[in-house]
UniProtKB/Swiss-Prot annotation:
Keywords: Developmental protein, Repeat, RNA-binding. Highly expressed in shoot apex and inflorescence apex, at intermediate levels in roots and at low levels in leaf blade and leaf sheath. CDD domains: RRM1_EAR1_like, RRM2_EAR1_like, RRM3_EAR1_like. Probable RNA-binding protein. Involved in the regular timing (plastochron) of lateral organs formation. May regulate the rate of leaf initiation and the duration of vegetative phase. Seems to be redundant to the function of PLASTOCHRON1, but to act in an independent pathway. Residues 294-415, 593-680 are annotated as: Disordered. Residues 223-295 form the RRM domain. Residues 404-413 have a biased composition (Gly residues). One of its GO terms (molecular function) is RNA binding. Residues 656-666 have a biased composition (Basic and acidic residues). SMART domains: RRM. This is Protein terminal ear1 homolog. Plastochron is defined as the time interval between leaf initiation events. Residues 328-340, 379-403, 602-621, 634-648 have a biased composition (Low complexity).
Amino acid sequence: MEEGGGSGVGGMQGAASNLLDAGAQAFYPAVGAPFPFQQLPHQLYCPQPPPPPYQVMPVSPPPPPVGLPVPPLPATMAPQPGYCVPAAATVVDGPASRAVVLSLVPPHAPEDEIARAMAPFGAVRAVDASAVASEGVATVYFFDLRSAEHAVTGVREQHIRQQCRLGQLYAAAAAAAASSPTWPPPAWDWPHDDNRGLVLGQAVWAHFAAASTVPDDGASRGSLVVLNSLPAMSVFELREIFQAYGDVKDVRESALRPSNKFVEFFDTRDADRALHELNGKELFGRRLVVEYTRPSLPGPRRRGHVSHQPLAPTPPRLQAAWRPAPAPSQSAQPSSSGSGKAREGVVLLRRSSGKGSSGSQSKGGGNAGHERKSKGGKSAAAACSTAASASSSTATAPSKQSQKGGGGRGGSWRGQKSGWEARFLFKEPEAAAAAAGDAAASETHEPASCKDTRTTVMIRNIPNKYSQKLLLNMLDNHCILSNQQIEASCEDEAQPFSSYDFLYLPIDFNNKCNVGYGFVNLTSPEAAVRLYKAFHKQPWEVFNSRKICQVTYARVQGLDALKEHFKNSKFPCDSDEYLPVVFSPPRDGKLLTEPVPLVGRSPAPSSASGASSPPKSCAASVDPLAQQLMTAPSSSGDGASSASSSNAHADEDDVHGETGGDRGDDAGLDLELQRLGYTD
């Protein structure tokens, strides 16, 4: 067989040619392979050497502990524009005072424990723990102002130290959990026995009490006033004299009265000792008169004015625990001032935040309430004659302002229903300013040279259970507060003090309750305006009454006219408390002149006769002369009947929510008088 020349399959004879011929040229590549196969070298397996025996490696000691300094208080940062401070973080720290408010106090902490915790900072005067159980807040009063400052600083430092200690303990616990050996306790940068500022072992927070809640009298501030010192005596000489009784904080001289000098001590006990030692003592040929200073005037001029800028940081826990206390009303201020009968804490009217408080008087006092600028060419003589007509019987048309609804304080109270004449309403600068753009209302304004001389006022909507004793107490408190503000202002020496010499509270002799209004004669027109500003449109706060007090001028003006009005009169009653009374000398709260009845008493009618003849009994149950004093509607004359008087009383009661049930509850009246301390 020839090589490569087979004619069949596998070179067998008889097979087709070029079919799967392994020797054919087509099965050989034309070009050599680019990656020729190379034989791999022989690989030997080399196992890893065995590991060395186990050895215990030494553990490096921990780094030495580093004491962390106490971080200082962050600086106060003014709020940026557009940045809203959360409501819970707006805790405002007031100016330095002797009252320190502690927050986050344990709810079971008693007063003695709180006092013991604050004793290291200074002598504690008193502790108020009434809100500890409910809010965890206590107020601590110190004798020394410096002690209060040290307490606030120490309590805050202790609070921050406790926070830093918790941070270090957390870091130590985390490091101990990451390593097996025991981690040494961290070292502190303060002694372990420093427990100052802790209440029952718990850190608290402290800030000064708000100025509105701190008493502003001289006894609480350690402030004295020397009334008749020599004008030539300098404040340095006066400081040397008072320095013998304690550290003096400040000595200053009155700008308007050089003979009056104010001395303020750090410690209230030193001020009390200096008052008792120097009052009445002769110095440089003049007897000294030393007294405590009066409370400051309300408003921005007050010494304890609270700034609305945050002064110190507030701990996060305090933001949820602290609740701002409501500001107390002015009527709740103590009003005794050397008087045993002017009782403290008897709140007769609830002051609102509007302009009706007694502290909203302008610099001009009562005269400012009657100064008007004449517009539209109205003559000053006509305006003065209209305002000064005390008992004129000529009816004056109501002003256009009262016809429109009486915006402001000078408008009509009940619109056209009451029918009060405009000449009996008080006019104030507030009403003039509100209607400055109203040409029609400007016609009723008085010129600046006109002064209202009326002094007798009518107090309306008095609760029917109100007695003459309660009304006297209310007027005494008002006079004391007004006179203290006049003395403290030192702005106008010619400003007259508030006092009154006549009082009449008409009584229904059947049920022994008042008929809803009363009359008071003040000793000056300025005092009448001050009483109007203090009580007009103020809600009463006794006997759950919903009445709103209203003050207007009375029809009969002046003490002499009132005496003539009640001349030869007798009242069918059995008590002098139901009679009109006068005071000589006038009563001002400090001088508690006893009331002297102005009229006599006749035998009281029996209940049987009253039952048999109701109309006659009704006519005799109320004094018919009382109706002639009030400012009746212009449609009725002065001689109104007793029946219309009774209807007027009922109308006032119905309008303000008082019904007949308010009058007949004698048991409730006795309980209220007993609660206020007027009865045993």
